Swiss-Prot record:
Lineage: Bacteria, Pseudomonadati, Pseudomonadota, Gammaproteobacteria, Enterobacterales
Keywords assigned by UniProt, alphabetized: Cell inner membrane, Cell membrane, Membrane, Transmembrane, Transmembrane helix, Transport
Swiss-Prot/TrEMBL GO biological process terms: lipopolysaccharide transport; transmembrane transport
A single cellular component GO annotation: ATP-binding cassette (ABC) transporter complex
Known role: Part of the ABC transporter complex LptBFG involved in the translocation of lipopolysaccharide (LPS) from the inner membrane to the outer membrane.
Parts of the chain on the Cytoplasmic side: 1-15, 75-100, 291-295, 349-366
PANTHER family named in the record: LIPOPOLYSACCHARIDE EXPORT SYSTEM PERMEASE PROTEIN LPTF (PTHR33529:SF7), SLR0882 PROTEIN-RELATED (PTHR33529)
Annotated membrane topology: Multi-pass membrane protein
InterPro entries reported in the protein's UniProt record: LptF, LptG/LptF_permease
Residue ranges crossing the lipid bilayer per the database entry: 16-36, 54-74, 101-121, 270-290, 296-316, 328-348
Designated name of the protein: Lipopolysaccharide export system permease protein LptF
Keyword NADP found: no
Length: 366
């Protein structure tokens, strides 16, 4: 039908515009956090773009349902304000046409949301953790921040490099405060150095024109050694991820895992897809605009219902993962309540319900 194609086209344009704006906002927020971590030396600077790209599926989990909800709300609200829907009703078209258009968009959005929460999201979460773990276990040159004192993760050493150029660096200061085994504390200063990457993942650090101070000043075995070249081999460390991290599990693994966190995550992912249809159905009657109130006030109830839904579901997921409640029971109770509310709102202005309401009104008057 031409009317349905028109409604779908107008809503899709609004949805894509809103999706782009929301992604841009969330993208900028994540960019600020990642850049802050890179400046502090927590992550290598060359991983900024990779981490940003891997964070898109996580952002899309909440943005996809919201983009459709706002797209329908704004498009239908505009059509009500411009009396286009009033003219459609005058021509004999019912609200079922609006519901059909909303459901068509909901199907396509739900497919994208399902692919995202079932495959793309877990894959990106797992790969993101792998990248961060690899960067921490085997930092290499990318993790060297020039002009800053950097402490090792275990606090055993402190490194300072004045300048870094590719695999070469100048003015090095390395203090091994708590060395392993029977080794004594030492301080190494060097004019320059470079890092070589081996095929097996190991790294060879070579320092040139420097001095090594070993021992403590209070002991007689304090040693000072000048050197032309000083080499150290840093072995490649294998990275192990947490196998119980539910964010990285696919749907089959979640289904077969009998833990509170797995059940909460499973119901949360299904809810994200179910929400697309439920909110699309609910937004049709909520988009009706009262000319005396204006579009902004007419949108408030819909926005409050949407916000309340996700606040409740987020709380249920968190408490369900901690074993404080049954996530399946409570999350789907909220889903069914909202679905029932959406059905009631769509049927509220139909002829059978009007007659039913009128009969109750007459009985109340008697």
């Amino acid at each position: 039908m031409i009317i349905i194609r028109y409604l779908v086209r107008e809503t899709l344009k609004s949805q894509l515009a809103i999706l782009f704006i929301l992604l841009l906002i969330f993208f900028c927020q994540k960019l600020v956090r990642i850049l802050g971590a890179a400046v502090d030396g927590d992550i290598p600077a060359n991983l900024v773009l990779s981490l940003l790209g891997l964070g898109v599926p996580e952002m899309a989990q909440l943005i996809l349902p919201l983009s459709l909800f706002l797209g329908l709300l704004m498009t239908l609200g505009k059509l009500y304000t411009e009396s286009e829907i009033t003219v459609m009703h005058a021509c004999g078209l019912s609200k079922a046409v609006l519901v059909k258009a909303a459901m068509i968009l909901a199907v396509f959005t739900a497919i994208v949301a399902a692919v995202n929460v079932m495959w793309a999201g877990p894959w990106s979460s797992r790969h993101q953790d792998e990248v961060l773990a690899e960067a921490k276990a085997n930092p290499g040159m990318a993790a060297l921040a020039q002009g800053q004192f950097q402490q090792a993760t275990n606090g055993s050493s402190v490194l300072f490099i004045e300048s870094v150029d590719g695999s070469d660096f100048k003015d090095v200061f390395l203090a091994q405060i708590r060395p392993k085994g029977n080794a004594r504390p030492s301080v190494v200063v060097a004019d320059s150095g470079h890092l070589t990457q081996l095929r097996d993942g190991s790294q060879v650090v070579t320092l040139n024109q420097g001095t090594r101070f070993e021992g403590t000043a209070l002991l007689r075995d304090f040693r000072i050694t000048d050197f032309q070249d000083y080499q150290a081999i840093i072995g490649h460390q294998a990275v192990a991820l947490d196998p119980n991290d539910t964010d990285q599990m696919d749907m089959r693994t979640l289904w077969n895992t009998d833990t509170d966190r797995a059940r909460a995550e499973l119901n949360w992912r299904i809810t994200l897809v179910f929400t697309v249809f439920m909110m699309a159905l609910m937004v049709v009657p909520l988009s009706v605009v009262n000319p005396r109130q204006g579009r902004v006030l007419s949108m408030l109830p819909a926005m409050l219902l949407y916000l309340l839904f996700f606040l409740i579901q987020t709380s249920l997921k968190s408490n369900g993962g901690k074993g404080k409640l049954d996530p399946t029971l409570w999350m789907w109770t909220v889903n069914l309540i909202y679905l029932a509310l959406a059905i009631v709102l769509n049927l509220w202005d139909t002829v059978p319900v009007r007659r039913l309401r009128a009969s109750f009104s007459r009985k109340g008057a008697v």
